[in-house]
A protein has these predicted regions:
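C-terminal lobe/tail of nucleotide-utilizing enzymes
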Residues: 104-165
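Switch II (G3) loop of P-loop NTPases
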Residues: 38, 42-70
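Charged helix-capping and loop-helix junction motifs
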Residues: 66-75, 100-103, 127-132
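N-terminal phosphate/diphosphate-binding loop that engages ATP/GTP or pyrophosphate donors
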Residues: 1-32, 36, 41-44
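Anionic group-transfer/hydrolysis microenvironments
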Residues: 57-58, 92, 121, 149
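Structural motif
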Residues: 53-55, 86-88, 117
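Inter-motif core of Ras-like GTPase G domains
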Residues: 67-91
């Protein structure tokens, strides 16, 4: 659907082998994130595609690099690249609090939230209420729900276009 034909490695600035926070993986593997590299790689990919989605790692407050030279959070990368944000959250118990706090953090730090996607969505009273409460408390629409095993994202094309505006 996306029409991407190149290797994943050509779309990534950094890919760590250790399944830990990026700052820790970088320290373990001796390959810290350089923001100029990230910016150059993003600009290169953006020239090739009309729409580019950047997947975050660990949430907006995730440390990307944290050492004597630099203290970089994911929010710094989002701001540097002038990205809009989508919040992806588990649909289950505890998500109202987690999503509301995440949206407030993003807004309070000068970024825009374009939508919310609920992951591991199975429906039912709790998850349906979670969705309604999240929209009510944040004013941000839930634009999609992803069920376990889904291979495609069901989202209205006009809604998706607004994410990239």
């Amino acid at each position: 659907i996306a029409g991407i034909t190149q290797e994943d490695s050509s779309l990534l600035s950094y890919l760590y082998q250790n399944a830990v926070s990026p700052h820790l993986a970088a320290r373990i593997e001796g390959n810290p994130v350089d923001t100029e590299t990230v910016k150059a790689d993003f600009d290169r990919v953006k020239k090739e595609y009309d729409y580019v989605t950047v997947e975050g790692s660990g949430g907006i407050v995730c440390p990307i690099r944290w050492d004597e030279e630099h203290e970089i959070l994911l929010e710094d990368i989002v701001k540097m690249l002038h990205l809009n944000t989508l919040v992806i959250a588990d649909a289950g118990l505890g998500t109202i609090n987690a999503v509301v706090l995440t949206v407030e953090y993003i807004r309070n730090h000068g970024m825009d939230v374009k939508g919310i996607i609920l992951n591991h969505y199975s429906g039912g009273a709790m998850q349906e209420d979670n969705e309604k409460m999240i929209e009510r408390l944040t004013g941000v629409p839930v634009i999609a729900r992803v069920r376990d095993g889904d291979r495609e994202l069901e989202v209205d094309l006009e809604v998706l276009k607004r994410v990239y505006d």
